[in-house]
């Protein structure tokens, strides 16, 4: 190619790139090609730990939150049934001294009526704990999140993509 042709190509924005240059960046080397590798995680050796952490976050965390919040209502309902004469024909002396049948029925009703607000509270507790513990887990493999440029405020969400 002549010198004039090179100058014309550089002026047009060619910048030395040829038609055979790859348009997309090259993929990672084979040892990094696993979908399980994330920054800070070494991939396949930590797969059982990652699965266990996901199990704890998604199964045991809600169970613990709901149990902790709903336990008082369950105890009140249990005490109401324990001291009612139709459930136990001969309630213990403590129950007879503390509650009549009307008092036991009131405990049962109070415990059952307190369940819906406590369910909402338990759901909020579970959501907040899950949100706080989410950074401890790596993102799911194969689902990249939106990228935001560092240092930009969240006023206008701008999605960045490689072009």
Swiss-Prot record:
Coiled-coil boundaries: none
InterPro entries for this protein: TMEM88
Membrane topology listed for this record: Multi-pass membrane protein
GO biological process: negative regulation of canonical Wnt signaling pathway
Keyword Amino-acid biosynthesis: no
Region (Disordered): 1-37, 136-156
UniProt KW DNA-binding keyword: no
Top-level taxonomic group: Eukaryota
Predominant subcellular localization, coarse grouping: membrane
A Gene Ontology cellular-component term: plasma membrane
Keywords from the UniProt entry: Membrane, Transmembrane, Transmembrane helix
Bias type Pro residues, positions: 136-148
Family classification: Belongs to the TMEM88 family.
This protein's name: Transmembrane protein 278
